[in-house]
Amino acid sequence: MTSVLNRVRTSVLEIAYEQSGSQDGVPVLLMHGFPYDPRTYDLVVPLLVAAGCRAIVPYLRGYGPTRFLAAETPRSGQQAALGNDLKELIDALGVRRPVLAGYDWGGRAACVVAALWPDKVRGLVSANGYNIQDIAGSTKPAPPELEHRLWYQYYFRSCRVDGQSPRVLQAAVAIMVTELAVR
């Protein structure tokens, strides 16, 4: 399956994207997650094209050939930025009511667009978490059983992590996981 690498400008980015299938097919935007790229969908795109769809797989901000238009633009992975990138991509491509599919950061972007601009979306497939976050609610403590399951998130944000090499971090996480497993 051959896809073509294209680029389109939005207000903030020059978004690189791969496209396969007929221009007349139902548009399906496949959004990758962190830290992956469009290769995630290499086995999916041929199935969509065979079903008559137009598969569009962009590189998210900060990935591959997608570039910020201005050096002074803040680099952000916030859900509002990711959602706006996708909304502007839909507008720039002129696709009408695509199906949005994504996981991780890409799933979050798809959920933001579906929630804020439902008239722009034919359907939504979101997998592997990171759906829309309640920013105000995230400032409150989670229930203890949830905090127990997400312990590693606090560790990653601790001062013990700053400046450490990936090997040191991997070893520290392995030790902590082992300690939890043998309890």
What are these model-derived regions, one by one?
Residues S11, P35, A80:
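Conserved phosphate-coordination/catalytic loops
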Residues E14-I15, P27, Y63-A101, W105-R183:
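Flexible "cap/lid" subdomain of the alpha/beta-hydrolase fold that forms the substrate-access gate
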Residues E18-F68, L89:
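Conserved HGGG/HGGXW glycine-rich cap/lid loop of the alpha/beta-hydrolase fold
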Residues S3-S11, P38, V44, R54, ...:
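Secondary-structure boundary/capping motif
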Residues M1-V28, A50-R54, E72, V95:
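Alpha/beta-hydrolase fold catalytic core
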